[in-house]
């Protein structure tokens, strides 16, 4: 379920999913962009009604947006629900391409800022703002210290936690894909994690 449905009761949605699973059309179901409350309510509904439950949740999670760790991670660990993080490099921001020019000509958020819909523009400024740029500078320095690409660092962070099943990555060029795949051989140790946490404390919630 791509977004929480604010109109249809969660029980009704889960019963519909349950039928699909019983018919063999779907193996497992997952949700996306939900809150700790929403995921907990859905999970309790599945238990009480003895119907299929969400096995995964797909949410925005990255060095620039670690909010999942506040509450949702606890739900996932206790209920054994896996996170599939998307935007692990913050929509490309963590690559550093927005540091020299706020909106490069060939970048996604440059197009967003020119969009006539204010909501689309707001999405761009959520990803690219003074705080995300400041945090990115620190992560670029940290990646350089460890001799890796900032993209590799970002993807490695997104898959570091035990409640993460897999990380959703995207690339337009082969070299971009290589930087992401390198993260699967790079392990974040305790010392590096402490440095990351220091940056996160210094610049709280860059994406709001």
Regions from the PLM with identified roles:
Residues 4-5, 9-198, 207:
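Beta/alpha (TIM)-barrel catalytic core signal, keyed to glycine-rich beta->alpha loops juxtaposed to Asp/Glu
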């Amino acid at each position: 379920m791509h977004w929480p449905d604010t109109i249809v009761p969660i029980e009704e949605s889960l019963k519909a999913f349950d039928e699909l699973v019983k018919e063999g059309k779907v193996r497992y179901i997952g949700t996306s962009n939900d809150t700790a409350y929403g995921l907990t309510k859905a999970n309790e509904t599945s238990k009480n009604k003895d119907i299929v439950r969400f096995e995964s949740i797909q949410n925005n999670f990255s060095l620039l947006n670690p909010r999942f760790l506040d509450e949702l991670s606890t739900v996932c660990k206790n209920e054994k629900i896996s996170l599939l993080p998307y935007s692990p490099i913050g929509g490309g921001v963590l690559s550093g391409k927005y540091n020299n020019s706020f909106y490069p000509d060939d970048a996604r958020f440059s197009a967003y800022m020119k969009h006539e819909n204010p909501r689309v523009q707001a999405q761009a400024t959520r990803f690219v703002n003074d705080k995300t740029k400041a945090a990115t500078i620190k992560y670029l320095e940290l990646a350089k210290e460890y001799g890796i690409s900032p993209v590799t660092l970002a993807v490695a962070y997104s898959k570091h936690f035990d409640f993460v099943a897999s990380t959703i990555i995207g690339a337009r060029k082969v070299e971009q894909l290589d930087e992401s795949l390198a993260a699967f051989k790079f392990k974040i140790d305790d010392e590096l994690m402490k440095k990351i946490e220091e940056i996160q404390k210094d610049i709280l919630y860059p994406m709001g």
